[in-house]
Every structure is written in C-alpha cells, then in structure tokens.
Amino acid sequence: MQTFILAGGCFWCLDAVYRTLDGVQDVISGYIGGHTAHPSYDAVCTGATGHAEAVKVVFDEEVIPADVILDVFFTLHDPRQLNRQGADVGTQYRSAMFPADAAQEQLFRDAISRAGELWDGTAVTTIEPVGTWYDAEDYHQDFFAKNPGQGYCNAVAVPKVNKVRKSFAQYVRAA
C-alpha cells in the first residue's frame, strides 16, 4: 500500500473521485500545511490557519499505478489556478502535494511535468513538507456519498467524477 497526500480545491471533490477508483483502499479528508494545531473546518475556511483542504489517498499499486493516481489528480483540478479552484478562493484551496519521502517527491515532480500536457499553461502546484496531518471532522468524510443531493456536490463534484470515469474507465470500480 502507498499513501499520497494531495490538495487541489475542495476535499469533497477529491474524495468523491478517488473513491470511484479500483485499488483505492481509503480516502481521508483533512488539513495539512498550516501553522495552527487541530484546526477546525471553520478556521481553515478563513485562510488564517495556513492549512490546505487535502486528502490522503491509500491505494494498492498492484491494482492502480501511482502515476494513474497522480494523473487523476491533475485531471480533476486545474493546477494553473493559484490559491483557488473555480469559485472556491483562498490558500486552503491551493494545488499542493505533500511527499512522504524523496521517492514520492520525484513521482510528484514528474506528475507536475506531465500536467503540462493536460493543461495549456504552467502548473502552480507546490510540493510542500508533509508536516502534521489533521483529519477533517467526521461529517466531511465521504461527504459526496452521504449528501447526494447537496447543491455544491451536484454542481462541482459530479462533473469531476464523470470526467474521471470517462478518462480513466479502466480503473473505475465496478458498480
């Protein structure tokens, strides 16, 4: 098993997409990259904590390659947008990757380079020290599945899930 920590907009969308992929064993929403201990969602949303909304993606590389996990990441968010994704604005929505070691850092750098093939422009995705991870509140975990009629999810997460299902069909879990 391998674990990647990735931030790219609202963690509800990242969580929703990664849960559709075969080989992904767990997805945990949380906060990382800031200076406040044990931040709350409300505090992170102010931007004052320095934390990003992020996900820990735990996956089996024998089922889904690490490069695919990372290519999905760059397919489902726009890495050219600094401190925002769509209407979500603030440093908590930054595009960032938090490597556990030098090998992951190299994988992440290679993925950022590949992102240039997907998007016209330069990625502003940062590679940041892993630091301390804080799980988000329980109601944020698997939010999309627990709140299927929620307006934000229907407007933002559903198109991302559909895009990844189409682009990475061979890795999507059987229904």
Swiss-Prot record:
It catalyses: L-methionyl-[protein] + [thioredoxin]-disulfide + H2O = L-methionyl-(S)-S-oxide-[protein] + [thioredoxin]-dithiol; [thioredoxin]-disulfide + L-methionine + H2O = L-methionine (S)-S-oxide + [thioredoxin]-dithiol. The active site is at 10. Signal peptide: none annotated. GO terms for biological process: protein modification process. The keyword Oxidoreductase applies. Its EC number is 1.8.4.11. Gene3D superfamilies: Peptide methionine sulphoxide reductase MsrA. GO terms for molecular function: L-methionine:thioredoxin-disulfide S-oxidoreductase activity; peptide-methionine (S)-S-oxide reductase activity. It comes from the Bacteria. InterPro entries: Met_Sox_Rdtase_MsrA_dom (IPR002569), Met_Sox_Rdtase_MsrA_sf (IPR036509). Keywords: Oxidoreductase. It holds the Pfam family PMSR. Has an important function as a repair enzyme for proteins that have been inactivated by oxidation. Catalyzes the reversible oxidation-reduction of methionine sulfoxide in proteins to methionine. Belongs to the MsrA Met sulfoxide reductase family. HAMAP family: MsrA (MF_01401). This is Peptide methionine sulfoxide reductase MsrA. It comes from Clavibacter michiganensis subsp. michiganensis (strain NCPPB 382). The lineage of its organism: Bacteria, Bacillati, Actinomycetota, Actinomycetes, Micrococcales. The gene is msrA.
